[in-house]
Amino acid sequence: MIIRSPEPEVKILVDRDPIKTSFEEWARPGHFSRTIAKGPDTTTWIWNLHADAHDFDSHTSDLEEISRKVFSAHFGQLSIIFLWLSGMYFHGARFSNYEAWLSDPTHIGPSAQVVWPIVGQEILNGDVGGGFRGIQITSGFFQIWRASGITSELQLYCTAIGALVFAALMLFAGWFHYHKAAPKLAWFQDVESMLNHHLAGLLGLGSLSWAGHQVHVSLPINQFLNAGVDPKEIPLPHEFILNRDLLAQLYPSFAEGATPFFTLNWSKYSEFLTFRGGLDPVTGGLWLTDIAHHHLAIAILFLVAGHMYRTNWGIGHGIKDILEAHKGPFTGQGHKGLYEILTTSWHAQLSLNLAMLGSLTIVVAHHMYAMPPYPYLATDYGTQLSLFTHHMWIGGFLIVGAAAHAAIFMVRDYDPTTRYNDLLDRVLRHRDAIISHLNWVCIFLGFHSFGLYIHNDTMSALGRPQDMFSDTAIQLQPVFAQWIQNTHALAPGATAPGATASTSLTWGGDDLVAVGGKVALLPIPLGTADFLVHHIHAFTIHVTVLILLKGVLFARSSRLIPDKANLGFRFPCDGPGRGGTCQVSAWDHVFLGLFWMYNAISVVIFHFSWKMQSDVWGSISDQGVVTHITGGNFAQSSITINGWLRDFLWAQASQVIQSYGSSLSAYGLFFLGAHFVWAFSLMFLFSGRGYWQELIESIVWAHNKLKVAPATQPRALSIIQGRAVGVTHYLLGGIATTWAFFLARIIAVG
């Protein structure tokens, strides 16, 4: 730690009334751009309007003004999030069977949407149990409401109204901090203060207050619910907070108050701050007492972290010092200059944050099934599948976004004249070695992983099962993964002496948790089939990275186009008269990367869906015999391409294809509609601009003949616009098709 003489006090850094609020200005489309504000000459105008409305870099080059716009937009985003949350809670309050579900979560499905009968839609309202007819939801809200201690629809109403108030507050804040009191640039660049507030305030106090809520409200209410007490009989949340005797009846150590804390006799609190591991056999979720303990521990860590950086007092770390000291024997100047990049380029900052958040979101996807955090979540198979799929897609999009903004940083904000021999410069100087090696890895992985399947299909087709790669013939066991599983399964008592069970049942052992005759979780065996598909995962991920990284490293220049930086982030080709230079812009790499991201995530969610139905999910008899949904067919069927098509895609699509006339029929319609949206994208991806321009001019001629030609001249989509429309429909159609396929299947059989 570096201790210096006290630095001068930091002043309040805002400008008062910098920009006047003007509705006339807002009402003028394109007011942010001199060209667009003139109004439309051609139909390209509407595309440019949408493309540039939030591209604040194109409105002004003043970093302070850009920062203020981004800051203000964040409040608008938060407002929308609060509005969305309010809607979710309102549906729970007004249209749901939450109270019925709470009283019997194993026999009643969650529903918070009832379809109005207009022309026969009431068929969509299926019987979810308990006499309630509605659409079964798979968002996990019921489970999280129960975990947080909500026992009535009135409480959901109040929360919904509270969220609306916060939404209004955020809208006001967005206006206030742009028009009334806008921060100066120095405020946005004061990273130590920002770290302190975000770490100690948002994450530290946020986790602490959640831990407090869990201990004082969630735990006692869930104790009562688990014991079968009628929700209407349970005391209200504020009674637990105000009346310590109520809590002391459930957790006797509460009677002693804070004495054990100050006398360091912390083990007294082990009644409600536990370290058990494994799952609660009543609910099939993590022990809520473990979760409360976790949030308390996390809060302490973040509160400490929030006090590590030097602000008004001359004590603590400075980020600039840390970065500049960060150099090894082979890394030249190391991280020197990184501080300046991250405080003057919000694209660089955003890129880093998106990469981290995307990876974290994918980690969340895996934790949601391996360590199901909420009561009765693990036995709600539709919700489990939805949560995994949702978090995988979101993570994939965020990671592609990271590459997009890294490339925008390279094109717009990177200054090669000031960067010499730091890590970024060194990476750029040996980018050819990086990309060519990565390319070799992709070719190797692609041929070998796919080759294993092709071998199996060929042997299977020729009737030679003994020559296939499988658990019963030539084994390719994932020995490293199995070793990691065993290490974790054996951890309790060795590395974690206080824990009674390992972190997740999936690691191994003999434990099985079933709730209401349904499997919540059991050890997940890994075999040859998983070895094969994991190498497909490796292949698709590496190709995605190859495309995205090439886009970033060659964003400013390449051997083909040395002056690429002058052409900008997105451009169709290097001008007329230079063939073979199309699809080289950084934007095009993001465009291509999106398709491979879609590939990668699709294989992951297919693997998950089939593996869980085959080896985990199912029912358990009174004798303890488990019957899995697809009877353990993953290990032998998924080792051929034909098996994936026949026993996964085709066999499991029967529910969505045969859904007509049932309450799942909407999924059947979506399945068809989304296939159409996907196919529609190909029209944009496989056609040239000139073809459409010719057609348009012929149609305009006909309009002129009839004297109904518009004043705005119609234009074909530009190459980039066509690709943008294409990839959007490709992804939207593909994701919605998968959604309909998964949900119709799992709601029918789960």
Curated annotation (Swiss-Prot):
Its membrane topology is listed as: Multi-pass membrane protein
Give the residues annotated as coiled coil.
Answer: none
Catalyses which reaction? reduced [plastocyanin] + hnu + oxidized [2Fe-2S]-[ferredoxin] = oxidized [plastocyanin] + reduced [2Fe-2S]-[ferredoxin]
Query: Please, which domain of life does this record's source organism belong to?
Result: Eukaryota
InterPro entries in the cross-refs: PSI_PsaA, PSI_PsaA/B, PSI_PsaA/B_CS, PSI_PsaA/B_sf
Question: What does the UniProt cofactor note say?
Answer: P700 is a chlorophyll a/chlorophyll a' dimer, A0 is one or more chlorophyll a, A1 is one or both phylloquinones and FX is a shared 4Fe-4S iron-sulfur center.
Binding residues for chlorophyll a, per the UniProt record? 683, 691
Name the Gene Ontology biological process terms. Answer: photosynthesis
Pfam entry (one): PsaA_PsaB
EC? 1.97.1.12
Binding sites annotated in the UniProt record for [4Fe-4S] cluster: 573, 582
Q: Which residues bind chlorophyll a'?
A: 675
- Positions annotated to bind phylloquinone: 692
Any GO MF annotation of the entry: oxidoreductase activity
Q: How does it assemble?
A: The PsaA/B heterodimer binds the P700 chlorophyll special pair and subsequent electron acceptors. PSI consists of a core antenna complex that captures photons, and an electron transfer chain that converts photonic excitation into a charge separation. The eukaryotic PSI reaction center is composed of at least 11 subunits.
What protein family does this chain belong to? Belongs to the PsaA/PsaB family.
> What protein am I looking at?
Photosystem I P700 chlorophyll a apoprotein A1
